[in-house]
Amino acid sequence: MNISPASLFTDIPRQLPEELCQTLFQNPNIRIERILSKGHYSAENTWYDQTQTEWVVLLQGQARISFVDSAPIDLNPGDYLLLPAHCKHRVDWTTSEPVCIWLAIHIQEENSNDYQNVGD
């Protein structure tokens, strides 16, 4: 078995014409992604409506997430959100410098309302 480290903060392309999502790990129930955003945002009048629960942390940069049914949230490095399945949301803005680095964990659950946000 060959186990070697990797870094979420390396191999960032200089040019990012669109948001870059890289799958780091995946099985039938979980997908872990690194997402790179450089001034990117959701298309106007577009809302994400995902079938999976998503836990996402902003590791670098700043961003704002809006929701259909609640106030927008500004995110700074270290801030994380637990987005239940079908929580309609969008990215209003992200910083270009520094590039935003996100770590997202998508969880496919039998009952998507059956989750616990530890720390609340």
Can you say where each PLM-predicted feature lies in the sequence?
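Short strand-connecting beta-turns/loops that link adjacent beta-strands
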Residues: N29, S70, S96-P98
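Ligand-binding loop in jelly-roll beta-barrel domains
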Residues: H86-N111
